């Protein structure tokens, strides 16, 4: 074939790709024609109704009765079509659609994922300026979750929380938040220059578990700021908590909105809420302005994939977009993005029944395990902030067996292959999801029965372990510098003994659950040090500290 003919034979297939960057609807439809899904002139599609019933000029790709039963979600379809092109790829990433993939990695995951590990090609849209399949995927997610707008996140819920706080709080503003918030909320205050107004959640002494925050606590915090001549820029609520405890968001949102204060909900553990009558209501249905959900935790997206949802007019959407563009990678992984689209579609296809089996298995497991001698099941802790609990989060107490949660977890993992999600001093927590099988439940029950039968082999928990209030380290939080000031201040290293009373210069956080105990700018207390040393001795991993042995700390030079 002559060079002229060669040029002509390929021109029709590939010139349209490289001449239309950024995304252009008319030219990007070709790769999706095979599936009957085109963004522009679309087969089996009609114009859609926009948010709040306003007619939209966009064309919806939502499947209708005439559409193929095998129709793929928009971003999944676009990624599949692009990967199937017979392309001569002179673009990133360097493995070149798997042709140069490391053999050790292909032995682990095969070669197919590399075909779909593509950059922001024109037909795949742009995460930060979406016009095509990403835009459509996010719109479909917004409709499913009840948002006016949804953003896909490839930096986990961490970047979603950071963006939400940066979009609502400016330097010097005050954010009301629980003292046991995730590390992402603390890093957000460093990034934004926001000042914290902490609420200390109620604490269940028997379980060594913190609850959510109450409407009365939020109201009190707002009033205290008003007496100081200040107004909260936003309120952050963690609901559900890692243990599945849900706050009364309906009342909290009503209180905040009466003061024109937006409510951000860290709903990382609750992307599934509202999709079954036995599940608690979602935060958006209760009035939250912003909700950040880890779609990978209970739903079926890939790890690190999350969503940020918005509704109402108290938050500037453009500021959210600008914040996300600063915080997220400029080279987002399209497998992560496509997994969000696929997880949304999976729920949409069978939203009324998809959680039936999972909930039944969780309730069955709780019923069987609650009858085992010496075992406690977290259902109704003794505090008022316990408004609701997620039935798919199951916390088992083992202190009556003379075991710590860390010891019980070690036995279950080594002897029964049961892997827990969260381990505490007195309990361990299990996360049920759509992939939970009956065999998993049977192994769990057998393992817990074994713990009970062999309890005579264990020494009773020491009184200082049984009776200590581990949440007491948050009782006397004193801030000498803002988190941002302390983060950038000059530091010096001192021994743990000499650190008492000094200003903490680092963020010290046991993980899981990722709740910081010492934050830059706070005075180091004996209670905080005692808790960190004890939980580390029980097997927790301490993150953030320059000295992971905790023999020394970084403190601020004043």
For the regions a language model picked out, list residue spans one by one.
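N-terminal chloroplast transit peptides
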Residues: 1-48
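N-terminal entrance/gating region of PLP-dependent enzymes' catalytic architecture
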Residues: 48-136, 140-143, 509-511, 526, ...
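A generic structural motif
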Residues: 241, 346, 400-401, 434-438
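PLP-dependent enzyme catalytic core of the Aspartate aminotransferase-like
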Residues: 411-415, 420-558
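Short glycine-rich or small-residue beta-strand-to-loop segments that form or flank ligand, phosphate
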Residues: 124, 151-153, 235-238, 395, ...
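Conserved PLP-enzyme active-site core in the AAT-like
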Residues: 72-78, 88, 108, 126-129, ...
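Short acidic (Asp/Glu) and glycine-rich catalytic loops that position anionic groups and cofactors
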Residues: 317-321, 339-348, 387-392, 422-428, ...
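Conserved small-domain helix->loop->beta segment predominantly found in fold-type I
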Residues: 352-434, 455-480
């Amino acid at each position: 074939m002559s060079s002229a003919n060669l040029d002509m034979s390929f021109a029709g297939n590939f010139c349209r790709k490289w001449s239309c960057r950024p995304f252009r609807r008319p030219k990007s439809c070709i790769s999706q024609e095979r599936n009957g899904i085109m963004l522009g002139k679309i087969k089996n599609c009609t114009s859609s109704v926009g948010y709040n019933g306003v007619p939209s000029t966009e064309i919806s790709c939502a499947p209708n009765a005439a559409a193929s039963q095998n129709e793929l979600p928009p971003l999944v379809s676009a990624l599949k079509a692009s990967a199937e092109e017979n392309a001569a790829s002179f673009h990133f990433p360097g493995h070149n659609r798997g042709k140069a993939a490391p053999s050790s990695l292909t032995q682990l995951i095969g070669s197919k994922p590399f075909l779909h590990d593509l950059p922001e090609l024109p037909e795949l849209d742009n995460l930060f300026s979406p016009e095509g399949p990403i835009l459509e995927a996010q719109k479909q997610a917004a409709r499913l979750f009840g948002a006016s707008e949804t953003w896909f996140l490839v930096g986990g819920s961490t970047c979603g929380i950071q963006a939400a706080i940066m979009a609502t709080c400016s330097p010097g503003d005050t954010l009301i938040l629980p003292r046991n918030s995730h590390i992402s909320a603390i890093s957000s205050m460093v990034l934004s220059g926001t000042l914290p107004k902490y609420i200390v959640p109620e604490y269940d002494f028997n379980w060594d578990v913190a609850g959510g925050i109450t409407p009365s606590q939020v109201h009190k915090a707002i009033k205290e700021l008003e007496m100081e001549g200040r107004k909260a820029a936003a309120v952050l609520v963690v609901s559900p908590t890692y243990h599945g405890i849900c706050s009364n968001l309906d009342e909290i949102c009503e209180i905040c909105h009466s003061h024109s204060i937006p409510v951000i909900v860290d709903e990382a553990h609750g992307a599934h809420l509202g999709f079954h009558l036995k599940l608690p209501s979602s935060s958006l249905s209760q009035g939250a302005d912003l909700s950040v959900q880890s779609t990978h935790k209970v739903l079926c997206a890939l790890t690190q994939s999350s969503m940020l949802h918005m509704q109402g007019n108290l938050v500037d959407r453009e500021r959210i977009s600008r914040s996300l563009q600063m915080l997220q990678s400029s080279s987002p992984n399209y497998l992560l993005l496509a997994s969000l689209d696929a997880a949304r579609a999976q729920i949409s296809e069978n939203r009324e029944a998809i959680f039936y089996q999972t909930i039944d298995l969780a309730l069955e497991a709780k019923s069987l395990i609650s009858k085992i001698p010496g075992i406690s099941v977290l259902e109704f802790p003794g505090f008022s902030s316990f408004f609701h609990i997620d039935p798919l989060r199951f916390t088992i107490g083992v202190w009556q067996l003379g075991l710590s949660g860390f010891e019980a977890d070690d036995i279950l993992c080594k002897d029964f292959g049961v892997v827990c999600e969260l381990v505490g001093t007195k309990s361990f927590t299990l996360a049920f999801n759509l992939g939970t099988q009956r065999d998993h439940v049977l192994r769990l029950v057998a393992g817990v029965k074994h713990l009970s039968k062999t309890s005579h082999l264990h020494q009773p928990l020491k009184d200082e372990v049984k009776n200590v209030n581990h949440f007491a380290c948050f009782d006397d939080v004193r801030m000498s510098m803002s988190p941002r000031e302390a983060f950038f201040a000059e530091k010096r290293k001192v021994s743990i003994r000499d650190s008492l009373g000094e200003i903490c210069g680092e963020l010290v956080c046991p993980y899981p659950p990722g709740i910081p105990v010492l934050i830059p700018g706070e005075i180091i207390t004996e209670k905080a040090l005692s808790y960190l040393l004890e939980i580390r001795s029980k097997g927790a991993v301490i993150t953030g500290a320059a000295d992971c042995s905790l023999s020394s700390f970084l403190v601020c030079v004043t």
